[in-house]
Amino acid sequence: MNRLSALDASFIYGETPETPMNVGSVAIFAPPANPDDVFARFRDHTAARLDLLPLYRRRLEMTPLGLDHPAWVDDDDLDLDYHIRRAALPKPGTMNQLRALVARLHAIPLNHTRPLWQYYLIEGLEDGGFAVYFKFHHCDMDGVAHMATLDGMYDFSSDSAPASPPRKPAPSAAPSPDFLEQTTTAVADFLRQVRSLPNLVTTLAKASRNLGRDAQYSLAYLWKTPRTRFNVAVSTQRSYGTASLSLPDVKAVAKAGNVTINDVVLAVCAGALRRYLIEHRSLPDLPLTAAVPASLRAPGDTRMNNQLMFLLCRLCKRPCSTTGARHAAPQRQSRCRFLARAGSHGLG
């Protein structure tokens, strides 16, 4: 058994019917040279890669009485008909129809008794192409691990395929712990955590002294963020929109402004939000605050889990202003350094 970290488990605890912790991506493919049996070939392609990543073969097992975080266990009875599905758009198969279908699929929570992932191959695009929608649970992995998963999944070179057909995993060498053993282990882990509390308090106190004014400045964001038309109760329905940006263009803008790609993306998002709020006559006087995920993953770390923190970044009121962007970038970098230090002390 592989116990989830507190961060991974938080995505389980925070899930509600209105806010399933699904993460997804959509890949759009050009019309295939051989359009026959596209789904069957995709299913075989996916099945041949099931042993390359632990994500595909593991499911959650809850701890008795909720005494500890859930754990990952091997699923020896994987049902590919549940995990790899087929859908089709009605004619004419526009992008709006694709977005509407993906929104409906993304609103459906994943079954926690099965491995937490699904692929949908969606046919019927108006140009003859097809799309693949990949859905997984945030407790599985973060964005960096997600990209590594897609790199392995969408590598269609002949030398990337496994040398042998997929195997059904052998039963675990040790049987799954029974209720008494799991409970005993969970209680022991809980007591170890209690004994570690004095050290945690010392670490927190030291971190607070080191962070000083930066901590007060960043935490003040939480109290100065204005309320907008987005601050409403979330329903079970989802909307899905898309936009395309040229990565070379984004890199060129970042280089010209001596900022990062993340800075450019934040400026684009801030500009879009500003335009939307102006059009709806609800632009607040104070700037908005964005919670931006940032990776804490060390180079070469390929584990399938979450290693990230959230940076609180104040969005410029005039994000397209060159002066505003140049002034905001050093301030944001300073606040990011503060939060990175907080994360290194176990606060992230």
Predicted regions and their residues:
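Soluble acyl-CoA-dependent acyltransferase catalytic core bearing the H(X)4D motif
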Residues: 1-7, 26-348
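Generic start-of-chain signal for non-secretory N-termini
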Residues: 1-22
